[in-house]
Design a protein with these regions (language model features):
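Glycine-/charge-enriched secondary-structure boundary and capping motifs
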Residues: 1-150
Length: 150
């Protein structure tokens, strides 16, 4: 899927122009190879951590099938595939609902999947559910929490 038009529309509607600082749309992460956590971590500044709640979406059947038939552990699926999340928009919490509305109006499945806050000293204790400094970028971190919705 190509997200460029929807992303541009979101920036223009919420930020009022094509970018800048201290604006509600902060970043986009196109989730391709390398999985959701690694792709999201590299668009976050160092010292910040996204907590992604797995129960905010259901895995598309194809990913469940790959896991089951291929005996691929969830951790490997998460480090390799997008698991149904093709694009993440990082926005200020105050505009989350408006962002979702703009994207849904554009025909994009959209939902709030988590929060962003300061990286905590104990976050790395989450093991495989924690990613920091991914894909050669010394950026932020992502903690994947919970179980996927049924």
């Amino acid at each position: 899927r190509i997200y460029s038009r929807a992303c541009l529309d979101l920036v223009q509607r919420l930020n009022g122009h094509d970018g800048g600082s201290d604006l509600p749309v902060r970043a986009f992460s196109h989730v391709t190879g390398g999985g959701l956590a690694a792709n999201l971590a590299r668009v976050l500044p160092r010292g910040l951590m996204a907590t992604v709640e797995r129960d905010t979406w259901s895995l598309p059947p194809v990913f469940r099938l790959v896991g089951e038939l291929g005996r691929v552990p969830q951790s490997d699926l998460e480090r390799t595939l997008n698991l149904g999340v093709g694009m993440v928009a990082v926005v200020d919490p105050e505009v989350a609902a408006k962002s979702i509305s703009v994207l849904v109006d554009a025909g994009i499945d959209a939902w709030e999947m988590g929060t962003i806050g300061a990286l905590t000293d104990d976050a790395a204790a989450a093991g495989l559910d924690f990613v920091q400094g991914a894909k050669g970028v010394d950026g932020g971190a992502v903690l994947m929490r919970g179980q996927y919705a049924a």
